[in-house]
């Protein structure tokens, strides 16, 4: 791959910027991070970059593209900078379609519900037990989908796996890590969820968290000691 100018990443920490940081690390892509405090995301300078006023966003000088929404950024990075399909699949293939399916499920099924569960448990100004119960049920439902699917996937001859798609770790798996790990630090067993009830998911997360690229991408959430 020819020389690549550093990609600018706006925002760090929280559940969504690490999804992008993990992909950048896994693909060894040069980048620089500009911190955007949550108190600044609705100010004109940042809204000019992301009109939705959320993090992350990127600017890629190699293609002169500004892009926001972490799922769209993940898709963009692997389509442009993973020609050897280290963590992706050939464009137009069934495996590529399946990987996109899991990415969309993460965006629609994991992110909103896990975020609401975390909000009502940790940040809402008053306790609303019915809201916590509703969203924790969704965490269990979504994690149950992952558990069932992983339990049916084959393990490679070298012992690697199981993975969501194609017998290898791909962006389809990696996109799930931040929220799936963060929620275990906020939602406690007494709230009705523990990853220990999902052994295939726990093993899957442990294997991903052992990857250097994942450790680097998650460092803002869980710094090494």
Swiss-Prot record:
Enzyme class name: transferase
Keywords assigned by UniProt, alphabetized: Transferase
Keyword Transferase: yes
Domain GST C-terminal positions: 92-225
Coiled-coil ranges from the UniProt annotation: none
A Pfam family this chain is assigned to: GST_C
Domain GST N-terminal residue range list: 4-85
E.C. number(s) listed in UniProt: 2.5.1.-
GO terms for cellular component: cytoplasm
Family named by the database record: Belongs to the GST superfamily.
Summary of the function given for this chain in its UniProt record: Glutathione S-transferase-like protein; part of the gene cluster that mediates the biosynthesis of trypacidin, a mycotoxin with antiprotozoal activity and that plays a role in the infection process. The pathway begins with the synthesis of atrochrysone thioester by the polyketide synthase (PKS) tpcC. The atrochrysone carboxyl ACP thioesterase tpcB then breaks the thioester bond and releases the atrochrysone carboxylic acid from tpcC. The decarboxylase tpcK converts atrochrysone carboxylic acid to atrochrysone which is further reduced into emodin anthrone.
Name by which UniProt lists this protein: Glutathione S-transferase-like protein tpcF
